[in-house]
Each structure stands twice: as structure tokens, then as C-alpha cells.
Amino acid sequence: MERLQVTERHTFFMKYYLAPMEGLTTYNFRTNWNRCYGGMDKYFTPFISNRHMNSRERNDVLPEHNVGMYTVPQILTNKAEEFLSLAEQLAGYGYHEVNLNLGCPSGTVVARNRGAGFLGTPRELEDFLDEVFEKCPLEISIKTRIGMDYMDEWAPLLKIYQKFPMKELIIHPRLQKEGYKGTPHLEAFAEAVEALQCPLCYNGDITSPESLTQILTKLPSIDTVMIGRGILQNPGLLQELKAASTESVALPSCEERLAVLKEF
């Protein structure tokens, strides 16, 4: 395996997050993946979309189901009062950070003006952010696409994001209409690096050490990445990324992993 051609900063300070994937990265998956492999700096839950959490959503964020992991619950809504109500409940469970989903490209979600669909109404989005950043008891991070249909939507969105003290902005540099097809627009991430002062995280098409090398070559300032589908395709991907960047990696034995899988 080729070693990542990265800077010393990347070798020692790269952070890795597990992406939220609806119906897939539930607490059962997160817990057992963490026991078999581990090493993620943050684990993001699939989105919560009900003001009054249903049993599945509540089980996913219960502290006893997230032991040993820095878990960040994600909320999908376009109503400030719903976001704040859920944030209050999550604060009661001891969480310190909540993530706003502005990235889901699903047609059913977008049709309700949520997820990436909320990006299509920037004035309403800014009003929403005004209220939640003023009143939320938790730190807020955001996961975003770069627009709905056109690349020129990104610059106005960056101007909105500049106004708010977000914990972190996680950018999947594709438009909503692109789904997961085509090549991520790395130049859009570079524009965010120039425009924003908050911490940034890159998300999109990290499936191998080589793919991460290509991204870092073009975006050398990246020190945090979020991985989703790549982990589902190759559960050991994170360890391959760390090994390629010369980080020391301690893995459970095959027998220990098998024992966990039998429990699952």
C-alpha cells in the first residue's frame, strides 16, 4: 500500500468522523464497529426528524447506547422551535454538540424544504439560524451541500455561514441535484477555506488511502474528514488511512472481532 503523501500536520493531527447514514449507522452499528475497529474522533447519528423522538430515535441517542464514543446527534428540520426542543432534550442526556442536516439530497426530504432543500430558501435559512444560534443550549455544527442546482448558490451561502459561531462546518462539495454522482467540487471547499474562520471538515468520496491523498493534494489545509459509504464498503478503511499516514494503529484480534460480530 502506498503511503499518503501528506504534510506533517496531517500525519499527526488528522481527525476522522463517521458520517450519519439513515437506517445504517444506528447505535448498533456504531457500537459494534467501534468495538471491532474504533478510532473515529466523532460519530454522527442518523438524523432525528421528530420533535417528540420516537422510540428508534430515542434509543439511538441514549447515553447507555453510546458509551466510549464522542457522539453527535443530528437534527433534520426547517423549524427553529423543533430544533430547539430537540436540542433541549439532547442537552438533558448530557450532549454538548448537535448537528444540523443541510446536506441530505433525498427527494422526499428536499420536497419538504429540509436537508439540502433548505438551501434553496436562503432568507428563511438565515432567519432559522439567527434564532437557533441565539437560543440553543448546545454548540451547533452544520453538515451542508454547496447548493441545490447551481454552483453560484455557494457564495451567498458562505456569506450566511460567516455570520454564525458554528462549532464546525462539514462540507460535502456537491449540489443537491447531483446526489452522489460525478466528482466533488473541490474548488467549492477551497472557497470555504478562504471565506470562513470556523473549523471545516471535508466529506465525500473517501474510499481508499489513494482517494484521500488526491483530495489532500488539492486541499492541503484539510485536517478533518468525514467518512460514510467508504466504511460500509470496507469496515477497515479507517485503519488503512491511518496506517498509510504513518499513524500507529492498534486493532482487536480476529478472535475479538468475531466475538463482537456473534453478539451483533
Segments predicted by a language model, with ranges:
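Glycine-rich, positively charged N-terminal anion/phosphate-binding segment
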Residues: 21-93
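Alpha/beta enzyme core
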Residues: 35-37, 84-98, 102-108, 112, ...
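Active-site beta-loop-alpha junctions enriched in small/polar residues
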Residues: 21-23, 48-50, 76-78, 103-105, ...
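Conserved phosphate-coordination/catalytic loops
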Residues: 77, 119, 123, 183, ...
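Alpha/beta catalytic cores of nucleotide-metabolism and tRNA/nucleoside-modifying enzymes
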Residues: 3-7, 12, 16-17, 27-28, ...
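Short glycine-enriched, charge-decorated loop/helix-capping segments at active-site entrances
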Residues: 113-119, 178, 245
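Hydrophobic faces of well-ordered beta-strands that scaffold small-molecule active sites
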Residues: 16-19, 43-45, 71-75, 98-100, ...
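N-terminal small/glycine-rich loop or linker at the start of catalytic domains
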Residues: 12-15, 51-70, 104, 111-112, ...
